[in-house]
């Protein structure tokens, strides 16, 4: 890697890289990364009938190099920010007035990040389909790429849901996977038992769209059930109770076989496009829209479903944060005693945080069930709660954009280990590289807690201001007038 964005000269003044220097640094980083990854990742060797053959994977190497360059750019924008560096450096001239500077690169790009990510998310499946049907450089990337994007969006939605409880309200929840499970089993049971029993088999094509709001409602009710016993708890005690709640739900799903089928699990029917199935029949999606049948059409449909659900989660959370309930969550997070002294009902504030966060988890769970087409209690162990919490913590508590970047990095690293099959020849026999994904997540958390304890996006601004912020000279501040 090249030198950081700022370097100290002999006179002690910091040098800020220009845009051209940053671009040169990114090009240099990409070239070095590509050269390193070419012999390691791009060339895959395999024993085939006693002979050693090699399979080129230059697309994967270039993609990983692009991820490294993107991460480097994020560090330039978010970590090596000149304003953040200046705030940490001691001021040698105490009497020098504080002069308002122009907006930093992060401030200028901040409002544009969300719309840019949304446009990229809409175009992403078509990009994967295009490269999947290209000249063979990326075989199978249409299915794999869209499936990876679905996983990332699913965990982004889960992260935003948990962010309501942990990031905004400051309530440490280690049992969030319980609401995820409630949503998944709600859809599975509604689609396989109750909806056909109540309305007949003709309701099955619409079971998913009917079950999503029901799953959100039932999960929110369970969130309130969890919220009542922990109203007076905080910190470690709250974490232990929520952890126990998640384990209770897992044990119920595992042992209440007459209702949940236990370890055998439940098969789940596929979703349809408002009653139009994705199959080869004359009434299928491809026939009605005069398209050639391809299974990728169903996965593209699932991608846009989870994109819409995630977008709803983002917009609702953003709107609630600006309402009185959102400001009450932030007040509760900062100081519960001061929150009570201001007349805020902490009971309803906590319960609404648990209920709304659980509702988003239930919606994500119902989508998980229809995507997997099979669910069992093994999908809802504590490790899932830890994984979601890691995404929230690494992204930055209270930061929605930070959770997006964190989910992409963590899920991307997890999937990358599936591709590092060359490690099988280095590691002991029988060792799967994918088993080291949690080791990488743990190492990332240790490094983040050491160097950026507030996450990828650390900027926490108040939701509302009483007055516009003004520049104040240092001499007034030293006299206590600022």
Identify the function of each model-found stretch.
Residues 2-482:
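Transmembrane alpha-helices and adjacent helix-loop boundaries
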């Amino acid at each position: 890697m090249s030198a950081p964005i700022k370097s100290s000269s002999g006179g002690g003044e910091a040098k800020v890289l220009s845009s051209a220097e940053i671009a040169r640094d990114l090009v240099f980083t990409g070239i070095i990364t590509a050269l390193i990854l070419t012999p390691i990742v791009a060339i895959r060797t395999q024993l085939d009938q006693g002979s050693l053959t090699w399979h080129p994977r230059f697309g994967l190497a270039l993609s990983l190099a692009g991820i490294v360059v993107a991460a480097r750019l994020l560090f330039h924008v978010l970590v090596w920010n000149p304003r953040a560096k200046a705030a940490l450096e001691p001021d040698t001239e105490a009497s020098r007035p504080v002069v308002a500077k122009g907006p930093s690169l992060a401030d200028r790009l901040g409002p544009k990040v969300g719309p840019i990510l949304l446009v990229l998310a809409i175009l992403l499946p078509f990009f994967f389909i295009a490269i999947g049907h290209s000249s063979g450089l990326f075989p199978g990337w249409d299915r794999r790429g869209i499936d990876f994007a679905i996983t990332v969006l699913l965990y982004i939605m889960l992260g935003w849901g948990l962010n309501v409880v942990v990031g905004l309200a400051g309530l440490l929840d280690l049992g969030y996977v319980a609401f995820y499970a409630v949503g998944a089993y709600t859809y599975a049971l509604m689609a396989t038992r109750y909806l056909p029993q109540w309305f007949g088999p003709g309701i099955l094509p619409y079971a998913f769209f009917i079950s999503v709001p029901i799953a959100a409602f039932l999960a929110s009710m369970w969130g309130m059930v969890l919220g009542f016993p922990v109203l007076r708890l905080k910190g470690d005690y709250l974490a232990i109770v929520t952890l126990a709640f998640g384990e209770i739900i897992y044990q119920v799903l595992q042992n209440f076989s007459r209702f949940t089928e236990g370890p055998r699990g439940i098969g789940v029917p596929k979703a349809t496009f408002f009653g139009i199935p994705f199959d080869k029949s004359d009434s299928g999606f491809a026939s009605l829209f005069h398209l050639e049948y391809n299974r990728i059409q169903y996965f593209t449909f699932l991608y846009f479903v989870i994109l819409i659900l995630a977008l709803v989660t983002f917009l609702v959370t953003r709107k609630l944060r600006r309402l009185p309930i959102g400001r009450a969550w932030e007040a509760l997070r900062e100081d519960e005693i001061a929150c009570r002294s201001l007349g805020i009902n902490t009971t309803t504030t906590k319960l609404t945080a648990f209920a709304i966060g659980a509702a988003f988890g239930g919606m994500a769970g119902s989508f998980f069930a229809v995507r997997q087409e099979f669910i069992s209690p093994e999908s809802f162990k504590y490790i899932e709660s830890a994984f979601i919490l890691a995404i929230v913590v690494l992204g930055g508590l209270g930061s929605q954009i930070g959770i997006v970047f964190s989910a992409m990095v963590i899920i991307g690293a997890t999937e990358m280990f599936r591709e590092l099959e060359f490690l099988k020849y280095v590691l002991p026999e029988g060792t799967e590289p994918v088993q080291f994904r949690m080791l990488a997540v743990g190492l990332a958390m240790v490094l983040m807690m050491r160097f950026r304890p507030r996450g990828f996006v650390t900027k926490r601004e108040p939701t509302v201001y009483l007055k516009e912020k003004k520049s104040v000279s240092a001499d007034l501040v030293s006299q206590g007038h600022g």
